[in-house]
Amino acid sequence: MKLNLYVLTPKRIIWDCEVKEIILSTNSGQIGVLPNHAPINTAVDMGPLRIRLLNDQWLTAVLWSGFARIVNNEIIILGNDAELGSDIDPEEAQKALEIAEANLSKAEGTKDLVEAKLALRRARIRIEAVNWIPPSN
């Protein structure tokens, strides 16, 4: 059996394809979705989206929060923004992580601290997406 996966942002369609499985970051933790999953509507947290294609190859994307609806083997993810793991430059992601860590250490005031923590979280998620090693079949 297959799942129809749609990942949409206000700017573009990130994904529109049949897949075997996904692993999604939600506000209550990560969930795995296989065919015939129980219907669910859930908030999507910032984090990785793991996609298992029909040929058993795994891909990764990064979601920057949103909403997901899973029903009748169809997954619709409406995201605020998203990136495919293959679009992330590892060197750029590492540099962004280093900058975020430096900015956090010199943050002053509540606003600066919150912004620095958010930037650090985003940078770590991007690094995780780039460095993720898929499970062996």
Swiss-Prot record:
It holds the Pfam family ATP-synt_DE. Signal peptide: none annotated. Keywords: ATP synthesis, CF(1), Chloroplast, Hydrogen ion transport, Ion transport, Membrane, Plastid, Thylakoid, Transport. Gene3D superfamilies: 6.10.140.480, F0F1 ATP synthase delta/epsilon subunit, N-terminal. It is found in: Plastid, Chloroplast thylakoid membrane. InterPro entries: ATP_F1_dsu/esu_C_sf, ATP_synth_F1_dsu/esu, ATP_synth_F1_dsu/esu_N, ATP_synth_F1_esu_C, ATPsynth_dsu/esu_N. GO terms for molecular function: ATP binding; proton-transporting ATP synthase activity, rotational mechanism. GO terms for cellular component: chloroplast thylakoid membrane; proton-transporting ATP synthase complex. GO terms for biological process: proton motive force-driven ATP synthesis. It comes from the Eukaryota. It is a peripheral membrane protein. F-type ATPases have 2 components, CF(1) - the catalytic core - and CF(0) - the membrane proton channel. CF(1) has five subunits: alpha(3), beta(3), gamma(1), delta(1), epsilon(1). CF(0) has three main subunits: a, b and c. Produces ATP from ADP in the presence of a proton gradient across the membrane. NCBIfam families: ATP_synt_epsi. Belongs to the ATPase epsilon chain family. HAMAP family: ATP_synth_epsil_bac. This is ATP synthase epsilon chain, chloroplastic. The lineage of its organism: Eukaryota, Viridiplantae, Streptophyta, Embryophyta, Tracheophyta. The gene is atpE.
